[in-house]
Amino acid sequence: MLEKEHPLRQLFWEVTLRCNLACRHCGSDCRKEAAVPDMPLEHFLPVLDDVATITEPNKVMINTVGGEPLVREDIVECGRAITDRGFRWGFVTNGVLLTKDLLKQLLDAGLRSIAVSLDGLEEEHNWLRGNSYHGAMNAITLLTKTKNLVWDVITCVNQRNFSSLQLLKEQLIAAGVKKWRIFTIFPQGRAKLNPELFLTPQQFRQLMEFIATTRNNGEINLSYSCEGFLGDYEGKVRNHIFRCDAGTMIASVLANGDISGCMSIRSQYAQGNIYHDRFSDVWNNRFEKMRNRRWMKKDQCARCKAWDWCAGGPFHLRGDNGEMLHCNYLTLCSAK
């Protein structure tokens, strides 16, 4: 159905490729100085005006992402302009630059949601993200005292923090965190250079058990990310059955102007560029490969009994030639 109907519900804006950290797992390979300059706000606003011609603004969430969005000195101005046009907005942050005063300014600018990255206990987090643990925890403390804001903590599970997830869960609960989201690494950017970032099949199955058990206990609202179909764990580790919404309900505008599906999809799958194309034209008339995925039914997918539910998996796990880079369903099958 989404081949014909593709209601835009989330639009990611890559506001910067600059970052105050240099995380081992960064899929964008972000640094303090970026090769691509920040997209000026005045270049993005016409995109929002165009989006408003094809859907009601209040139905679309604008996710400002990076890099680290808070390195932009005009991030409050960006948020206010998004709000003034009737859109909701939020962002993902490492938390280091978030202060009480800045949070108030962001809320006054209409901020609706924040996700803070915390990747383990202090030693594990700092191994992955440099000496930033206390900055992340300070941000989380600020958010626990904030009303009328949707927020959660995001954790990248890897070899270093896998064995301490129970302790991390207890720490988050004690800190007042209500929502926790877990994801695992895929081979992109700096991440593909470090084998310690990847779980074994047995560890991945244990992770699914940990999430399912935690959800059943009701101690904290924990969910697994959208990293593909999970077989028997569907319905147990997140609130919905897997579906890749890239190009059907989710779009992105990258720092260089490229228009794509979700932020994690490889650059060669870009469908246009805001400096050459109208966003609405691209959204309505392109994205064929993301909306009609029958071309994915090849190689291991052609023989897979889960095809009817999985439909080729998440688009960001497809390589340069459309090949499957990783399949969590097959990983779980191999761990039985």
Model-derived features: where do they sit?
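Conserved alpha-helical substructure of the radical SAM core
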Residues: 1-112
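Conserved, mostly hydrophobic/aromatic
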Residues: 19, 257, 279
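Buried hydrophobic side chains on well-structured beta-strands
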Residues: 62-64, 91, 116, 153, ...
